[in-house]
A protein has these predicted regions:
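Functional-site microenvironments in short loops/helix caps that host divalent-cation chemistry
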Residues: 1-155, 159, 183, 190
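Short coil/turn motifs at beta-sheet boundaries
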Residues: 131, 165-167
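Short, structured beta-strand segments at or near domain termini in extracellular proteins/domains
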Residues: 167-182
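Pro/Ala/Gly-rich low-complexity, hydrophilic intrinsically disordered segments
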Residues: 176-178, 188-197
Length: 199
């Protein structure tokens, strides 16, 4: 059995696991930065031309026929495709991934900060279904995304999903904050404490 992504996980489940692990779900901005892998002028994580050998997506006319040029008709094991420039696997295709951000179609308030937190839950809505509950942003596309249906296997693409929904094509990944570097003053004190000089 391969190392498959965890699926059938609602947002609340993913968030609970992240808290337990001492990590968190990425913001939409963090996710997109990681997905681009240092390449900010390309359409896909791997370049500007679509290639079925780069991500687990639907090849053919959805939902009638999948040519499976990538070798998979459903979820693939993690690492079945080449990593991006940061060494991250499956940032597009395979399964959608939850982000910490609430969905708002116009991304209001996100354009002026480096790591925007997105909109508030109160402002989150789907203009086509304003009566529905607030939605979270999902990123990356999945093995069900096809050119004729859902070509969202691009870092900049986004979709919304009800927070209480877990499906066979939505998973998550976690982010951990870098540990603070020891400052020179602290290193000097530590050296003194273990027999270092006081120079």
């Amino acid at each position: 059995m391969g190392n498959y992504p965890v699926v059938h996980v609602a947002y609340e489940d993913a968030e609970s696991y992240a808290n337990w692990a001492g990590k968190h779900l990425p913001t939409e901005a963090q996710w997109e930065y990681a997905a681009r892998g240092g390449g900010f002028n390309t359409i896909f994580t791997w370049g500007n031309q679509y290639s079925p050998q780069q991500a687990n997506t639907w090849q053919g006319k959805f939902p009638f026929f999948n040519q499976q040029q990538d070798g998979f008709g459903g979820i693939s094991p993690v690492g079945s495709f080449p990593p991006n420039g940061f060494g991250l696997f499956d940032m597009t295709g395979n399964v959608w991934e939850w982000t910490a951000d609430w969905f708002r179609i116009d991304r209001r308030g996100m354009e002026y900060s480096f790591n925007p937190l997105g909109t508030s839950r109160v402002e989150s809505y789907d203009p086509k279904k304003p009566w529905e509950e607030a939605m979270h942003v999902i990123k990356g596309g999945s093995y069900l995304c096809a050119k004729n249906y859902c070509s969202r296997y691009r870092p900049g693409a986004r979709e919304f999903q009800a927070s209480d929904t877990g499906t066979s094509h939505i998973g998550f990944r976690l982010v951990s904050e870098p540990k603070p570097a020891l400052g020179d003053d602290l290193i000097h004190v530590l050296n003194r404490g273990i027999g270092g000089s006081d120079d």
